[in-house]
């Protein structure tokens, strides 16, 4: 295999990014030097390890997984694993950093020449869902293990995650400004409601089932843009919680 060969379809494999090109390079732990476009045997082996580590983290959860579990699943000796990474936490970091970096990188590339806010939102939703539908184990790891990293590793991943969230919020703000609506949903609510719709598909969506990815994207986009009861008069959507209703605790003594 040529060291310079690009994969035929990067959406079908776990993409390898520049693990050494960190914004806080002076503070980050030393990681293997791997150019993002050089698919050498070294790159492919680490990719293989990360893909299997993500699957095991998704199945057992991060804290219940040991490096020995990953060694057995990959057929790579413990000494071999530590040749590629220093710890289990570093594996988790590489998975999270790679995912956020890749999905953000592709999104920014696709949005580069797009001006219409609604088109930007459709691209955002399609980019997010199509990526994670192809990487369901990684999506579960991102959702469940968001706080499992600590220190500089957590800070580094959180920086990319925050950038991604701010981009979604900015697109929604542009849509609000374009529509000039007098009654507007709070931007924070809208942003996290959108991610809530997209991020939990690993609980129910089957990429091999009847609902294809393109149909999933279309349904989520329509639901977010138009609502479940599209066409219902606005006056019927007015709702105010009853005054005086107390929060309900699961513990009776707290009610």
Task: Please give the residue ranges for each predicted region.
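C-terminal peripheral helix-coil segments that are non-catalytic and often amphipathic
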Residues: 3-34, 130, 134, 166-174, ...
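Helix-turn-helix
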Residues: 35, 48, 56-90, 94
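Amphipathic alpha-helical linker/stalk segments
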Residues: 36, 95-122
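Generic hydrophobic, amphipathic alpha-helix propensity
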Residues: 45-54, 70, 91, 95-103, ...
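Amphipathic alpha-helical packing segments from all-alpha helical-bundle domains
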Residues: 101-104, 108, 152-178, 188-192, ...
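Short, hydrophobic secondary-structure boundary micro-motifs
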Residues: 140-143, 184, 235-237
């Amino acid at each position: 295999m040529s060291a310079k060969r690009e994969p035929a379809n990067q959406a079908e494999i776990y993409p390898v990014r520049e693990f050494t090109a960190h914004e806080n390079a002076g503070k980050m732990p030393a990681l293997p030097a791997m150019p993002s476009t050089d698919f050498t045997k070294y790159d492919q082996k680490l990719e293989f390890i990360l893909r299997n580590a993500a699957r095991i983290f998704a199945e057992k959860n991060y804290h219940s997984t040991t490096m020995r579990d990953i060694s057995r699943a990959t057929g790579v000796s413990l000494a071999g694993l530590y040749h590629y990474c220093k710890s289990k936490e570093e594996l988790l970091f590489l998975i999270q950093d790679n995912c956020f970096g890749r999905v953000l990188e592709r999104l920014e590339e696709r949005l580069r020449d797009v001006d219409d806010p609604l088109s930007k939102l459709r691209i955002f939703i399609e980019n997010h869902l199509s990526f994670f539908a192809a990487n369901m184990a990684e999506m579960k790891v991102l959702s469940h293990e968001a706080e499992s990293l600590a220190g500089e590793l957590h800070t580094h991943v959180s920086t990319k995650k925050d950038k991604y969230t701010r981009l979604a919020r900015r697109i929604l703000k542009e849509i609000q400004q374009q529509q000039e609506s007098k009654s507007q949903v709070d931007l924070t609510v809208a942003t996290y409601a959108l991610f809530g719709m997209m991020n939990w598909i690993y609980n129910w969506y089957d990429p091999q089932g009847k609902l294809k990815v393109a149909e999933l994207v279309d349904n989520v986009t329509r639901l977010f843009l138009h609502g479940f009861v599209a066409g219902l008069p606005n006056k019927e959507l007015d709702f105010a919680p009853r005054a005086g209703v107390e929060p309900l605790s699961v513990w009776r003594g707290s009610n």
